[in-house]
Amino acid sequence: MTVASQSIEEFKECLYHMQETRKLLTMQLLATGKITSAEIQILKRTLEEMQDERTTDFYIRHIHSRGATFAINIRDEILGLKKDFLFLENFASECESEESFTNRLKLCDLPGLLSNNQIDIRLMNGFAEEVAKCKEFLMDLITIESDGIKPLFITDWDGTMKDYCSQYATNLQPAYSAIVMGVFARNFTRAFAVLTAGPLRHPGILDLTSLPIDGPVMFSGSWGREWWLGGRRVVHDDGIPEEGSVAIGQLYEQLEEILHEGEFVQFALVGSGVQKKVDRLTLGVQTVFGQVPKELSAKYIDAVKERIHRVDPNSQYLILENCSPLEIEVCVHSSGAIWNKGDGVAALVEFNKDSLKLGKVCVAGDTTSDLPMLQKAAQENPTQVRALFVNVNKEIQSTINKIVGDSSRTCFISCPDVAHAAFAQIIIELTQNA
């Protein structure tokens, strides 16, 4: 029996075309507060395509390229589209009768929609309680003290403001998330910055977000080594030798070649895919569901090693690191200290001519790699630092409470949608009569 499949090129083109519409809708809503039903139909068509006969009941979609057929899990893509279409359809309907953006948002009941569409029944049952807790935390954050200074909000992306996705290349932010993030950032913070480990482009956070890249939220990649600020890319390459930067660029071109060979083509969609960062390449070698045959994964890693040897035959500039069973990294030998997200925060503050010592500072994250951001903020502003962390275990919670020094200034939630729902409630409550 022949299994129906879609080409990798068609799959990505379908989703990327839809994402451009999401970006336009978000920009339009942030500017005018209005959309029409006709403008959101591409989301409906994309959702229908993602759920056609090429996708099983368990979100497994069959993809082909150059004679090879493989399966990928598109649960995040489908669930994001479902929630987005429901929200935007309701919002467009309210635009026909309601005059204010706030009333439209209120009548759409985004918190209720998100609660009813959680994949985990445990999240669904406790969703409203978590949203109330998160809202209280955020209301305290944005309450302006006598100094009149709005807070600074610095956040990780994947797992914190955006659900994890099996394919980094199609880890696309829904419009509902972008809209409430954008309005919250614009109205209640002096700066709202995303600091992610992934790259800015090809693909990167600037391609995957639905927010306008020169809008109310700032974006960085490579642990804050590269920022999109003032309409341009600002790079902090301290400690990275020029020869190493050249070598990593050459290796990226080499890997682009082997990903166009039939045998390894699926690795463009496996986990991290191929991410070119300032000082390294991150390569996905296995999915979280173990869908790649072990022999093929090992063969791909060998091919990567062979290309490293071509570019750097004497191992002067590049080093291969096995990060996890899911990905490997090829890093540039650095002559300086190891860069972390705390350094990225310092780079942002310096560029903006801001200070962590001013006002309240909230750091949001979901893993230990986000702790350096919190530590940096706590060192500079120990009495006003706050932490919002997503789906972390008790041990990490304890570490966070120790860094902050006051559990009343920490908040732990189960998923990014809790924060989105809390943003929506605050926008409605504080702008109702504005």
Swiss-Prot record:
Chemical reaction(s) catalysed:
alpha,alpha-trehalose 6-phosphate + H2O = alpha,alpha-trehalose + phosphate
Q: Which GO terms describe its biological process?
A: carbohydrate derivative catabolic process; dephosphorylation
UniProt cofactor(s): Mg(2+)
UniProt entry tagged with the keyword Hydrolase? yes
Extract the InterPro entries matched here.
Answer: HAD-like_sf (IPR036412), HAD_sf (IPR023214), T6PP_C (IPR049063), T6PP_helical (IPR041064)
| Any one GO molecular function term | trehalose-phosphatase activity
Where, by residue number, does substrate bind? Q275, K276, K277
Protein origin, superkingdom: Eukaryota
Q: What Pfam family does this protein match (any one)?
A: T6PP_C
Q: How is the cofactor bound?
A: Binds 1 Mg(2+) ion per subunit.
This molecule's function is given as:
Catalyzes the hydrolysis of trehalose 6-phosphate to trehalose and phosphate; prevents the accumulation of toxic levels of trehalose 6-phosphate.
This chain belongs to the protein called Trehalose-phosphatase
Q: Which organism is it from?
A: Caenorhabditis briggsae
Protein encoded by which gene: gob-1
